[in-house]
């Protein structure tokens, strides 16, 4: 089994409902268990301004799927929830990013793990570190909290600390 950390984000429609539906779909993946989910945070758009605010969260899973198969499954969930990939950093019903896939490192056209922008995004690190405060970034094993300490966190607010049982 491999421990996987994901970041989920949405800024269209009923944002909280999209997060919930994505979590339910992730919990139903074959050979996969949803172990934990973070609180939900509201943040301004990153990368492309002038959009609606995002809701962001993280979750931890345990899977027997390969990273490539896991990516296909998350992309299928995005598509089933109406995700249309027409603009980089544009609005989306749901975005599911693989942040960490065990200690594995991937650098292919389809998959880059650890996620290449995670250390630059407080809206990713805050919920991720809520799940695992001592998490380290492979392969250098630097604490992720050290990256977070260097980032502006002023535009991130707690939206919901509510936890759902699976």
UniProtKB/Swiss-Prot annotation:
Q: By its UniProt entry, which Pfam families does this protein fall under?
A: HPPK
Q: In which pathway does it act?
A: Cofactor biosynthesis; tetrahydrofolate biosynthesis; 2-amino-4-hydroxy-6-hydroxymethyl-7,8-dihydropteridine diphosphate from 7,8-dihydroneopterin triphosphate: step 4/4
Offer one example of a GO biological process linked to this entry.
tetrahydrofolate biosynthetic process
UniProt entry keywords in alphabetical sequence: ATP-binding, Folate biosynthesis, Kinase, Nucleotide-binding, Transferase
The record's section on Gene3D superfamilies has: 7,8-Dihydro-6-hydroxymethylpterin-pyrophosphokinase HPPK
Q: Which InterPro entries match?
A: Hppk, Hppk_sf
Coiled coil residues, start to end: none
Keyword Mitochondrion listed: no
Tell me the protein family, please.
Belongs to the HPPK family.
Its protein name is 2-amino-4-hydroxy-6-hydroxymethyldihydropteridine pyrophosphokinase
> What species is given as this protein's source?
Streptococcus pyogenes serotype M1
